[in-house]
Amino acid sequence: ICPQATAEIPRNVGHPLASARRLIELLGHQYPDHTLHVVGDAAYASQALRGLPDNITWTTRLRKNAALYRLAPARTGRRGRPRTKGNRLPQLAKLAVSMPWAAAEVTRYGTTTAVELAHRQCLWYTPFGPQVVQLVMVRELSHTGYDVALVSTDLRATAPEIVERYASRCRPLDTPVPR
């Protein structure tokens, strides 16, 4: 990253995620014709992510206690402020039981494995506000419930692409490093 771009970012101001967002927005501004895919763990999700530019997507692991909501209903035609979110969805464990699962092959950490995926669009209002996100739940073929829940602002990506993108964020400690 060029020193001139990083010099514009104030240090020790606010949450580290807010600083990271400003840096990513600078990159997005420098490359407006490219889509930047940012991936992080559950700690990298806060209100600092509201209103991301169109050319920046954010993929993160979902917290087990995350409050997910249906999409905002259509305007009723009555006076007053329209609703910004729909009804609350059940907890992730209950949601996993009611969602349809499909088998898929994904490449994670250097190996291709068969897993089951379930996905839907919803709102994770706490970090992303009214921005629609894609929820992807992953489980091994022999498991019930879910193993990992991911959320992404990239609505064009398929569920396997989101899983592979999240798995590419780092190498697990027990994976040998290529020489």
Located regions from the model:
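Short, well-ordered loop/turn elements at secondary-structure boundaries
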Residues: P32-H34, L52-N55, H143-Y146
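RNase H-like nuclease fold core
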Residues: I1-D33, T76
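Short, well-ordered alpha-helical microsegments
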Residues: A45-L49, A159
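Short, surface-exposed basic-aromatic patches at helix termini and helix-loop junctions that form
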Residues: L49-R61
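Short, charged/polar micro-motifs that form catalytic or ligand-binding hotspots
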Residues: P10, V39, A43, R165
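An anionic, glycine-rich sequence signature occurring as long contiguous blocks
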Residues: I1-I9, T59-P172
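Short, conserved catalytic/metal-binding motifs centered on acidic residues
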Residues: L36-Y44, W58, L150, C170-R179
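Short, glycine/acidic-rich beta->alpha junctions
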Residues: S19, G40-Y44, L52
